[in-house]
């Protein structure tokens, strides 16, 4: 028994359109999830993750660097983005030397300038933090 609504549609037709449309979009969603899951391992740079990178991430988290800096766009906007700091400062050894010297030289006490606190990190912690920042800079963000 189908009751006709205005415009000639029946309740059964409306139900079928709803179910068909819902199924269509669920399948589209599942396809996109599958595609994304297949592509993520190519972009995460997980193969290059070393123990130094893991320790560097721990230094990053313990000192709340994200409280002032951004990393891949996430975090606070008080201080510079650090995902590509190594590449911006010359890459390879020169980038690492710059980052470590900068960290050791803080605060600069320049009037009117934002100051980074001195964290008194050991050379090992600085090396690990630099490795973490290098690794982060090599993640394929596809230019976002």
Feature map (PLM): residue ranges:
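Post-cleavage N-terminal segment of exported redox proteins
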Residues: 1-49, 132-144
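Arginine residue identity/basic-tract feature
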Residues: 15, 39, 43, 55, ...
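Short extracytoplasmic/periplasmic juxtamembrane "stem" segments immediately C-terminal to an N-terminal membrane anchor
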Residues: 45-62
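Extracytoplasmic electron-transfer domains, predominantly the class I c-type cytochrome c fold
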Residues: 51, 58, 72-76, 83-140
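Short cysteine clusters
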Residues: 65-68
């Amino acid at each position: 028994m189908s009751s006709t609504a205005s415009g000639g549609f029946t309740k059964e037709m409306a139900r079928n359109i709803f179910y068909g449309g819902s199924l269509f979009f669920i399948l589209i969603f599942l396809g996109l999830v599958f595609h994304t899951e297949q592509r993520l391992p190519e972009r995460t740079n997980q193969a290059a993750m070393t123990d130094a990178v893991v320790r560097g991430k721990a230094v990053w988290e313990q000192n709340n660097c994200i409280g002032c800096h951004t990393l891949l766009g996430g975090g606070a906007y008080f201080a510079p983005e650090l995902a590509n700091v190594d590449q911006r400062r010359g890459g390879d050894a020169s980038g690492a030397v710059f980052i470590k010297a900068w960290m050791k030289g803080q605060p600069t006490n320049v009037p009117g300038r934002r100051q980074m606190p001195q964290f008194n990190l050991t050379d090992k912690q600085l090396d690990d933090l630099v490795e973490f920042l290098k690794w982060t800079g090599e993640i394929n963000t596809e230019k976002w």
